[in-house]
C-alpha cells in the first residue's frame, strides 16, 4: 500500500528484506514488481545453476556435473561474479527506495511533484535502451578479459602444476604458499626473482631512456632549418616504424648471429674478435637494448618532433634578445616545454617496456642460461619468466603468482613515475 508520506528508513528496510518492497511502499508499483522479479530469478538461479559452482569454488572437489578442477574453478568464478552483480543490484535497490522516499517527503506539499516521481521518474524502456546497446560489448569484455584475468589471479592460490593437473589429478587451494616461495628471503626462488627484477627495471629504464634520447637528438637535428631535405630524412628515419616489430627483431637476430652474422663478419674483417652476442650475459643484454632502440626511436622521433613544432618561435626570439645561448634556450625553454607534453607518453612507454615480451622472447629467448637458476636466463624479464614457468616447466600456479607480482610491480612503478614526472598534478590542474 503506497504511503502519502513514506519514511526513508522504512522504505530502505523493506527493500532490504525484499527487493522492490520499498518501491511499492513509495507508490512505484511497476518498479517494485520488476525489482522483486529480478530477486526471484536470482534466488531460483542460486538454488539451481549457481549452487554447485559456488560449493565447488570453496572445495575444488568434483560436484554435480563438474569433475575437472579447472572447470569447477572457472564455473565458480563466473557464479561469484553473478552473486556480486546481484549484491550490487540489491544495495542499489535499497538506496533507491530510501532516496525516493526522501524526495517524496521533501516535496510532500506539492502533489504534482510526488505524482511525477511515482509515475514518470522511472521509464523502464527509456532507461534500459543504452544498456541494451552496450550489453554485447560488456559480455564480450567480461568473458574475454575479466574472466581470464580473474582465473589467472585465482590460480596463484592453488597448487596447479604438472603433478596436480586435471583430468588425471586435481589441484587444491594452498593459500599464499606460492607467494611465500617466491619472496622467502635467502631462497633460490627469491634470488632468481631479485636477479630478473633487477634486469627488468634496468631494461625498462635504459630502453626508455636511450630510445627517448636518440629520438630527441634526431628531432633536434631535423629541427635545424639549415638542413636541406629535412622531410626526406624524417621519412627515412621513420621507416623502421613501418616495419613490423617481429620482422625487425628477426633481422637483428640474423645480424648478431655469432657464427655468420654480418656484424661479427665485419669485426673479423677489421682484425677484431667476434662478439658472443647471445652467449655472454652482458653482450646479450646489449643486443636487446640495441634492438629496442632501433624499434622505438621512430615513435619517439615522431612525438618529439610534433611537440617541438608546437613551441612558438616568439619564445626563442625573446630568449635570443635577452642574450640566451642555444644551450640555455634548450635547457630552460625547449626541454621543460617538451617534457610537459611527452612526460605522460614516457611513463606509459616505461610501463610498456617493463612487460616487453616480444623482443626478449624472439631475440634471445631469455638466454643465455644462468647456472642454478629456476629456468630464468640472463636476459629474461618477469613476463618471459612467467611464460617459461607456465608453458615450459608447467608450473602454472607459480607462474600465476609471479604474474600477480608483476602486476603489482608495474602499478607501483607507474605511480612512482607519474608522481616524479608531475603528470598527476598536471592532470588535476587541467581538470
Q: What is the predicted role of each segment?
A:
Residues 1-12, 30, 34-128:
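Transmembrane helix recognition focused on a "late"/terminal membrane span
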Residues 2-42, 130-137, 199-200, 234-236, ...:
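Alpha-helical membrane-anchoring segments
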Residues 7, 12-14, 19, 24, ...:
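A residue-level detector for conformationally permissive "hinge/kink" positions
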Residues 8-10, 15, 20, 82, ...:
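Generic detector of short alpha-helix boundary/capping microenvironments
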Residues 11, 19, 23-24, 31, ...:
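Short, charged/polar micro-motifs that form catalytic or ligand-binding hotspots
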Residues 19, 35, 39-42, 46, ...:
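Helical transmembrane-bundle signal
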Residues 53-55, 130-431:
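A structural signal for multi-pass alpha-helical bundles of membrane permease subunits
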